[in-house]
Regions:
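Short acidic alpha-helix initiation/capping motifs at coil-to-helix transition points
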Residues: 1-2, 31, 50-53
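Amphipathic, coiled-coil-like alpha-helical segments
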Residues: 2-5, 21-30, 61-76, 83-116
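Generic hydrophobic alpha-helical segments
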Residues: 10, 38-39, 77
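Short, charged, low-complexity loops and linkers
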Residues: 9-22, 52-53
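An anion-binding catalytic pocket shared by soluble metabolic enzymes
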Residues: 58
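Short helix-adjacent coil turns
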Residues: 16, 39, 43-50, 65, ...
């Protein structure tokens, strides 16, 4: 079940500055739109090291949102080699991460509109 984003970390980083929070949301929106297709492409090319590296990078920005389920998917992709996950399992994680990204992207778009 998807829970609403927790922007408290964004406000902490921005020291309450609404304009800065909006900039952080715009960066998050960009990542949510760009990284999932890149992850799918890397998976399709069987570039597993690059996929794990991108999952790590993506996880770093998602960690500040309180999206724990999504963050866990990214951690699972990142650690897929250590955990000996099969290609099928990794593909499922990539698909689920993409679905989560779509949900979050809609929520972020609404938050950006509210701050306009």
């Amino acid at each position: 079940m998807h829970k609403p984003l927790d922007l408290s970390h964004f406000y902490d980083i921005a020291e309450g500055n609404e304009d800065f929070v909006k900039k952080l949301l715009l960066i998050l929106q960009k990542n949510l739109n760009e990284y999932p297709p890149q992850m799918q492409s890397l998976f399709d090319k069987k570039s597993m090291l690059a996929l794990r590296e991108l999952a790590h990078k993506f996880k770093s920005c998602i960690a500040y949102t309180g999206a724990d389920e999504f963050n866990k998917l990214l951690v699972d992709i990142e650690t897929s080699e250590v955990d000996n996950l099969s290609e099928v399992q990794i593909g499922l994680l990539v698909r689920k991460a993409s679905e989560q990204a779509q949900l979050l992207a809609k929520e972020v778009a609404n938050l950006i509109k509210e701050k306009a």
